[in-house]
Amino acid sequence: MAADGYPLLLLQKTFPQLLCIEFKWVDIHYSKANSQVLPIMWQIPKFMYAIFREHNTLKHIVDAYGIDTIISDNRFGLWHKKVKSIYITHQIGVIVSPKNKALNYLAYLLHKKIINRYDECWIPDFEGTDNLSGDLSHKYPLPENAYFVGILSRFQ
């Protein structure tokens, strides 16, 4: 298993018998204002480099440890052509700006392109009107490899 920060600590506590690898990601900074356009735009080079770096690091990890399945929790670069790769997200549509529908649609298309690199996309929500994620997962058409898996929670 690979993660960083609190998710890594949770995985180590939950699965102490399994190997855990620290896999850092960049810190994302959001604006306190409604629009995230400029804050996200300024971070695009950092995101692109991080995606490239994590994808290359993953190749080495797969080779070194003989990984046969990857489950990525919203990490864009954690897919591998030769290994079953699953992407988990509740956000198919990305709301970059509440007022700019064209920009939000462009963000959706870019995210869909990322999702299509994976074998499957799991959406932790319910299909239909009784759902938790609203427009984030239900506004735009789902990629062909995406489906709803119900609520995922460690709480019982």
PLM region spans:
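A nucleotide-sugar donor-handling region in carbohydrate enzymes
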Residues: T89, V94-Q156
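Conserved nucleotide-sugar donor-binding subdomain of glycosyltransferases
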Residues: S35-G77
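Short loop/helix-cap segments at secondary-structure boundaries that form the rim of catalytic
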Residues: L9-F15, F76-V83, I115, H138-L142
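Structural motif corresponding to alpha-helix initiation and N-cap regions
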Residues: G5, F52-N56, Y108
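Short beta-strand elements of ligand-binding domains
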Residues: D73, Y87-T89
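Conserved nucleotide-sugar phosphate-binding/catalytic loop shared by glycosyltransferases and other
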Residues: M1-I44
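Short, well-ordered beta-strand core segments
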Residues: C20, I70, S85, C121-W122, ...
